[in-house]
Design a protein with these regions (language model features):
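Conserved beta-strand segments of alpha/beta enzyme cores
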Residues: 96, 121-123, 164, 187-190
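Short strand-turn motif at the edge of the Rossmann-like AdoMet-binding core
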Residues: 102, 145, 168-172
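Active-site capping/gating segments
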Residues: 171-212
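Short, solvent-exposed loop/turn elements at beta->coil junctions and helix N-caps
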Residues: 49, 129-130, 190-194
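A short glycine-rich, Lys/Arg-flanked "PGG" loop and its adjoining helix->strand segment in the class I
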Residues: 152-165
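Class I SAM-dependent transferase core
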Residues: 1-75, 105-122
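Short glycine-rich, flexible loops that bind phosphorylated cofactors or substrates
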Residues: 148-149
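Conserved SAM/SAH cofactor-binding pocket of Class I
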Residues: 57-142, 152-153
């Protein structure tokens, strides 16, 4: 599909993939995010003007790369402001979502937002990824968290042969993937275009890396 360019297009994209209740919660999340961003740097200030495209649609598009019947757990590493994890949890209230974040102020904010919006499907792991207990995640996501080699090193223990990986990347996606394939990843991932940025890509994969 064409790249989303306006906030109206971004909101319409989200509305087509969310219930009315979820869309209302996204609006509230946006208000809370803008307010908190005056106290701590959760997202780039300029991106608040394009929050529906840059953050909400950018997160919701990840759902198109996993089966609709998937109910989790969805593990979001280095969630930061809750992107994409909180957006996924809002859009899919039937999906169990686990947010991993190490920074104290952000942990507190995620806890407050989760309670304020009334999300019952979110668990917050307020610690480093290395300290999170091993689990079998159905989906693993990470936005601007770490280069692919380090990401896989940290997160492979959360994966199974059936795990889906959805990893938003910028222009480096192809290069990162080629590096890992040379190291023995053997076609586990492929590259998808982002609907929110002509230069951005998403690494999509399934399984458990076997070379680590």
């Amino acid at each position: 599909m064409p790249v989303l360019e306006t906030e109206e297009e971004g909101r319409a994209y989200c509305a087509a993939r969310c219930s009315t209740e979820s869309l209302t919660k996204l609006e509230l999340f946006g208000e809370l995010l803008a307010e908190e961003n005056t106290r701590q740097n959760l997202i780039a200030r300029d991106s608040l003007k394009t929050i529906w495209v840059r953050h909400f649609a950018d997160s919701i598009q990840l759902l198109t790369h996993v089966p609709r019947e998937t109910t989790g757990p969805w593990l979001d590493l280095g969630t930061g402001a809750g992107l994409p994890g909180l957006v996924i949890a809002i859009a899919r209230p039937d999906m169990s979502v686990i947010l991993v974040e190490n920074r104290r102020k952000r942990i507190e904010w995620l806890q407050n937002v989760t309670a304020g919006i009334g999300l019952q499907n979110v668990t917050i792991e307020g610690k480093k990824v290395e300290a999170v207990a091993s689990m079998a995640a159905t989906v693993i996501s990470a936005r601007a968290f770490a280069p692919l080699p380090k990401l896989l090193q940290l997160s492979t223990r959360f994966s199974t042969d059936a795990t889906y990986w959805v990893l938003p990347k910028g222009r480096s996606a192809v290069q990162e993937l080629e590096t890992e394939e040379q190291a023995g990843l053997h076609g586990m991932f492929h590259v998808e275009r982002s609907v929110t940025d002509a230069d951005a890509r998403i690494l999509v994969g399934r399984g458990r890396p076997s070379y680590l």
